[in-house]
Amino acid sequence: MLEKIREELNSYFLERREEIDIALTSILANEHTVFLGNPGVAKSQLIRAIASHINANYFEKLITRFTTEDELFGPLSIKELKDNDRFVRKTSGYLPTAEIAFLDEVFKANSSILNALLSIINERIYHNGDRIEKVPLISLFGASNELPEENELLAFYDRFLFRKVVRGIRSYENLSKLIDLEEEYKPKTIIDVEDVKKMQNEALKVDISNIKDDLIKIKLSLESEGIRISDRRFKKSVKAVKCFAYLNGKEKADENDLDILRHIYWNEPDEFYKVSVEIFKISNHFAGFALEQREILDSLMNEIKKINKDRIKLGGIEYRKCLEILGKLNSMSITLKDVKNKAIEANKPYELVEDVLKEVEGFKKYVEGLLKG
């Protein structure tokens, strides 16, 4: 069932393979995910689409500095207050009764609602007046254009096990597909919450004995690079690896399933590259090479931005610079195709190599267009 959902989502959401895998793993692991990124990269649309595949109590709210507790946790019961002098909220249909939840602009939450949010996502409880209500939450998804800066929000941010910076579509091929894409996503495969719980239990049975040493090596290696991983986050990450392996149809996890750790172990977006490099050293050096090529591609894109486009047609230094960049892109394309074939031969995941290859090919077309004028 999950494989069908995965396929449906990937067929519609272009260049969102990692985000989809993170979200589905998050649901299997009973954990929470935050997607970061500029407006317009379909963070909200993707989260809604994922939720549409599960027949669950769903709650969604756009958070502002002025969002009140009533809007998230439900209005006060006037009857309880009048008849019994009790301060109780009517929580039905609000966050305390949700199984899947989405808070957009999640880090705009004010201090008055943070403590309640922490109890809900941490302990799955809500303090409703003088009683404690159990919260059936499977996963809470957050979206934000920026990381939190206030200290009081950092503890809340830390409770999102999975983090991902969502980028705009980069490949020429996928931009072309985007033009013809239907406006509305329509799920075909829908599962019940009981199905989710059954899969969660099955995922916990995945054998990780082959990669225990690798898990420890990665943690120690990253900490030697100055990236601290708390014991709690490390323990939860082991469960995430099991769930990712299960998502990949395995009963026994292998080094390829360590890839999910790339979206767990960083705190600042600048750490993502360093974390990925260390993990790929153990799990998949083909993907590690592709990541290095993406860094080079980003630098070439920045070089193009600095060029005066109007002067390229004059055939001077700007034209020669574009030719030089095009030569590098041609070389990268040839190398990435070779690396992709080697990854396939070695039975290693090659999706990241393919993604970067498409990005290179797309940018190559753009540079060729500049040279043609």
From Swiss-Prot:
Gene3D superfamilies membership: P-loop containing nucleotide triphosphate hydrolases
Molecular function terms from GO: ATP binding; ATP hydrolysis activity
SMART domains: AAA
Pfam families: AAA_lid_8, bpMoxR
Signal peptide range: none
InterPro entries membership: AAA+_ATPase, ClpA/B, MoxR, P-loop_NTPase, RavA-like_AAA_lid, RavA_ATPases
SUPFAM superfamilies from the UniProt entry: P-loop containing nucleoside triphosphate hydrolases
PANTHER family xrefs: ATPASE RAVA
Protein name: Uncharacterized protein MJ0812
